[in-house]
């Protein structure tokens, strides 16, 4: 009798707790199927800096990676992001889609590395590359330069027997507008102001929007592209350094690059959730930018300031969230 009473009481308590025993319990919300990450593969300038590779940024959506620019060291930085940051989509063989902002050497010197190393690492399909006029010619010349290597690796009677597709490149010369779209991302190009034909890119994914300026002075097109974006990646240089440039370089910079004051004003109008400053003429190396926060003239002719100068100058004029990007940062 006591056992029967205990069973009935237990059932009643269960009913009181769960309500209707036939009604399924609520389930935890499912995670989003994708999570977009921004990986800074290179934040440097034309001046060699051991801490900073040439400009290169990866937008990673799930298992897919999309590169913007391929400066010196891009593939090795991608491998470092794989090994040190766990970004598996950046395995070199998986680097299959890339965009270039303009054809200056500091943004493109890693192009042959991207083509050839990705192929020898196992890429089995042609790489798709998008950029301004001149990209096709650059691509053809790179492939011709490595013709003997390609022939040696693909000869049927040879020992290497590399696949015959992974070295190929489909180069697309673009204009403003939507230039790429797949199941996870839409990429829109917009014109920027630099020394040659140049573009910035906006990436729209299921969970984030990312805008990358490339080299440019501040433009209304960048502000329009960034309206409501989650992340804006933009170049900048410290006013303290800029004001000490020789007149000819100051004139070039005024028309083709962005100062700390200007990036603060631009971001105030564009209102990104996060501003990432990259391709800044700064260095963490005292021999390149001394701790006294004064620019220094290198033997290469480059001028750099220390990062805290740039941080201070932007912070004095911009109230939004911003960071000074470093290689292998993930956001």
Regions found by a protein language model. Name each.
Residues 2, 22-211, 220-222, 286, ...:
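Binuclear metal-dependent hydrolase catalytic cores
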Residues 207-209, 217-326:
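Cap/insert and terminal regions of metallo-dependent hydrolase folds
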Residues 18-20:
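Sec/Tat signal peptide C-region and signal peptidase I cleavage site
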Residues 5-15:
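Bacterial N-terminal signal peptides
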């Amino acid at each position: 009798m006591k056992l029967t009473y205990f069973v009935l009481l237990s059932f009643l308590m269960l009913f009181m707790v769960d309500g209707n025993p036939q009604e399924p319990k609520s389930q935890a919300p499912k995670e989003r199927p994708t999570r977009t990450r921004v990986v800074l593969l290179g934040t440097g300038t034309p001046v060699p800096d051991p801490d900073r590779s040439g400009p290169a940024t990866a937008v990673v959506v799930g298992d897919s990676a999309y590169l913007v620019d391929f400066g010196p060291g891009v593939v090795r930085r991608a491998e470092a992001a794989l090994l040190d940051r766990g970004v598996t989509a950046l395995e070199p063989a998986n680097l299959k889609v890339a965009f270039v902002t303009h054809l200056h050497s500091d943004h493109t010197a890693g192009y042959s590395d991207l083509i050839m190393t990705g192929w020898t690492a196992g890429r089995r399909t042609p790489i798709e590359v998008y950029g301004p006029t001149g990209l096709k010619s650059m691509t053809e010349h790179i492939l011709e330069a490595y013709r003997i290597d390609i022939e040696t690796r693909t000869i049927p009677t040879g020992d290497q027997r590399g696949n015959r597709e992974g070295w190929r490149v489909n180069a697309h010369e673009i204009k403003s507008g939507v230039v790429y779209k797949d199941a996870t991302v839409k990429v829109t190009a917009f014109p920027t102001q630099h020394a040659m034909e140049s573009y910035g890119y906006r990436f729209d994914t299921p969970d984030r929007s990312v805008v990358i300026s490339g080299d440019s002075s501040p433009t209304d097109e960048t502000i329009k592209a960034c309206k409501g974006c989650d992340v804006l990646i933009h170049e900048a240089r410290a006013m303290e350094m800029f004001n000490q440039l020789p007149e000819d370089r100051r004139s070039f910079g005024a028309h083709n690059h962005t100062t700390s004051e200007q990036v603060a004003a631009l971001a105030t109008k564009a209102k990104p959730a996060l501003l990432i400053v990259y391709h800044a003429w700064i260095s963490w190396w005292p021999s390149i930018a001394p701790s006294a926060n004064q620019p220094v003239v290198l033997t290469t002719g480059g001028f750099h300031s220390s990062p805290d100068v740039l941080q201070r100058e932007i912070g004095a004029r911009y109230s939004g969230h911003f960071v000074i990007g470093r290689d292998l940062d993930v956001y």
